UniProtKB/Swiss-Prot annotation:
Name of the gene this protein is made from: TUD1
Transmembrane segments: none
EC category name: transferase
Location of the U-box domain: 64-138
Protein name: U-box domain-containing protein 75
Naturally occurring in which organism (per UniProt): Oryza sativa subsp. japonica (Rice)
Length: 459
């Protein structure tokens, strides 16, 4: 039989000695602290603590949340636990919804409920509050320690530390920046402390024509970690000397540095005062394409494609430059090997490049354009199918005698029939119909049927 024991504060709990021994409460005083005050306000405050810990990724600290604190319905920690007559405990709101739907069984045991009145489990609520209060106190202390350390590092780098010292130089500067980057990566709230200590201006000033890549890579990593950048900071980062350093690191740095440079450039492109000609650099575009081609690092591929897509959108003259570095055949070759989430951005770029004459010629001249575009039809998403159809329309319209038969040989006819009969939107079906007419203009029914490999029934 379960052993129930009375607590001085009221309520009952299953094996309270075990709970104390296992450290669920972490000592008697915390239970009293958690239980103090208005009982009605406690769940609200507890929920705020849980939400803040969860947002910081520190829901349980180094320990897992005890299973007894988890609601079997939502699988989340309970704030206002209530117990049914079967002995099972649930979050009050969750079990109330269950009962409101007309259920008269226990969700966990499926036993019939002879009494549907939930009983507030005040002791378990106190246990939960005490456990999360201890986690919250430790979290706040750690946060304060991290914030203080981040501020110390910023002041040491600026030369404003107390007692007064010269700004850190050489390897000491690199080590301090590396520690600051680690703090910002591990604790998102540290980025605010960096900004409050004047870190944004410091990091911006460190980027220049004479900055070593060791310092520059750490500074850029911190800037893209979530440190708030205002308009003045972004304007300073758009200075030619600083952009030149970013381009150099994009071409010569480690993969992580390249990705961070790409992300920082994208952040700058979102600023209203961004000058589009800033990205009209062959060196920058070559560096981005090199990152996109490195299939060993999917994060780099995705970041590079996003930047190229943004450049095509905000600076149309750059499209010809992108074509001139051989981006069209490289992207077409990559299509079958790209992760699913990267296919659509790649097709968006190719669609934008097809808007300039050089891009259309490059698409037609690439031997894999038709094969890879046909393969993508009805494979990834409706948007990808639309972009692939646009590519096929461009090449088949430019050279129908050459490209239309090649497209049918690649299985385009059957794919177009599939698109027309699918649940896609009417515009996409119309696009497929027009492409089908173009490809079958000089093709007999017999030849078309044979190339589509249709069965007699379908014929």
């Amino acid at each position: 039989m379960p052993q129930y024991q009375e607590l001085p504060c009221g309520g009952q709990v299953l094996d309270i000695d075990t709970a104390l021994k296992d450290g669920i409460l972490g000592g008697g005083p915390e239970l009293g602290d958690a239980a103090a005050g208005d009982g009605g306000k406690q769940p609200v405050e507890l929920r705020k603590m849980m939400d803040e810990l969860d947002a910081a990724g520190d829901g349980g600290g180094d320990e897992a949340v005890p299973a007894v604190f988890i609601c079997p319905i939502s699988l989340e920690p309970m704030v206002d636990p209530v117990t049914l007559c079967t002995g099972q405990t649930y979050e009050s709101a969750n079990i109330s919804r269950w009962l409101a739907l007309g259920h008269r069984t226990c969700p966990t045991t499926m036993q019939e409920l002879w009494d549907v009145t939930p009983i507030p489990n005040t002791t378990l609520r106190q246990l939960i509050a005490a456990w999360f209060s201890r986690r919250y106190t430790r979290f706040k202390k750690r946060s304060a320690d991290f914030h203080g350390r981040a501020a110390e590092l910023v002041h040491a780098l600026r030369g404003t530390a107390v007692p007064k010292r010269q700004p850190l130089k050489g390897q000491a500067r690199v080590a301090a920046l590396r520690e600051l980057r680690s703090l910002a990566a591990a604790h998102q709230s540290v980025t605010k402390a960096i900004a409050e200590a004047g870190g944004v201006g410091l990091l911006t000033s460190l980027l220049g024509p004479f900055t070593s890549h060791a310092v520059g890579s750490e500074a850029v990593a911190i800037l893209v970690s979530g440190v708030p950048l205002d308009a003045d900071a972004k304007a300073a980062l758009m200075q030619p000397a600083k952009v030149s350093l970013l381009v150099d690191m994009l071409n010569e740095g480690a993969v992580d540095t390249k990705i961070n440079c790409v992300r920082l450039i994208r952040i700058l492109m979102e600023e209203k005062g961004f000058r589009p000609d800033t990205v009209a650099s062959l060196s920058l575009l070559v560096g981005v394409m090199r990152l996109v081609r490195d299939k060993r690092h999917p994060d780099g591929v995705a970041a590079g494609l996003e930047l190229l897509n943004s450049i095509c959108a905000v600076h149309k003259p750059a499209r010809s430059l992108i074509v001139s570095i051989g981006a069209v055949p490289q992207l077409v070759e990559l299509l079958p090997e790209l992760p699913t989430e990267c296919v659509e951005p790649a097709l968006d770029i190719l669609d934008a490049l097809a808007a300039v004459p050089e891009g259309r010629i490059a698409l037609k001249d690439c031997p894999r354009t038709i094969t890879n575009a046909v393969r993508l039809l009805m494979r990834v998403s409706e948007a990808c199918t639309r972009r692939a159809l646009s590519m096929l329309w461009v090449v088949c319209r430019m050279a129908p005698e050459e490209c239309a038969p090649a497209a049918l040989d690649a299985g385009l006819g059957a794919k177009l029939l599939l698109v027309i009969q699918s649940g896609c939107g009417p515009e996409l079906k119309q696009q497929a119909s027009e492409l089908l007419k173009l490809c079958t203009m000089n093709c007999t029914s017999t030849v078309f049927i044979s190339k589509c490999k249709l069965t007699k029934t379908i014929q």
